[in-house]
């Protein structure tokens, strides 16, 4: 489908030159496209500055444009001086490619295409810095990490190749507390251990347990924490109730050689058993 509109020449326009549009006060204005830009149209006749002209837009796949320099078949093209077509290696400004050779000043036929496959070299990317270009050229994860991470100890950590020196340096980087460093280096003193307990545990009763010297209150609270309740006291044993008994006093072996003395020794044993609560 053809689209037609009226435009005003913003400057003198020459036939078969590449054009760009701009917005005027009340009308579209046209002029030669700037160098190294993508054009919008191509002129098919001369137009003087300030004159109105009818712009007819056809669904064309190719243009004929004045060559601004010698052009070879297949050259990628961009806008040259005064709206001419010139070869370019900058993929961001390519608008087509030549299908025939042309010398400077001759008409060249070109296919309008921005989808032509273009090989982009990393070094040609203008907005990329040296570090970015180095990163784009890397094809291994470890190589990329070596560019992104400057610290040698951090590199060793990420690559899984830490030495003892790397480990110590990383601990110095990551931790400011000397007690934590001592723990990580397996060189804790009693003072370090006490300080670490204070860092890790807020409960006073647990701290008392860890110190190896819990108070009576600590013990009671710890038993409550673990659901042990209060200490169990055995009831006194009776003839009908199982209970606790005390150890009886020592009793020497009887040396009686007559009945009276044997009875006396037996009664002494019975007294000891009663006192211990073993018998009633």
Swiss-Prot record:
It comes from the Viruses. One of its GO terms (cellular component) is viral capsid, fiber. InterPro entries: Phage_B103_Gp8 (IPR022741). GO terms for biological process: symbiont entry into host cell; virion attachment to host cell. Keywords: Host-virus interaction, Late protein, Viral attachment to host cell, Virion, Virus entry into host cell. GO terms for molecular function: identical protein binding. It holds the Pfam family Phage_head_fibr. It is found in: Virion. Protein that forms the 55 capsid fibers. These fibers are not always present and may have been lost in some lab strains. They may enhance the attachment of the virions onto the host cell wall. Belongs to the phi29likevirus major capsid fiber protein family. Homotrimer. Forms a super helix coiled coil in the homotrimer. This is Capsid fiber protein. It comes from Bacillus phage phi29.
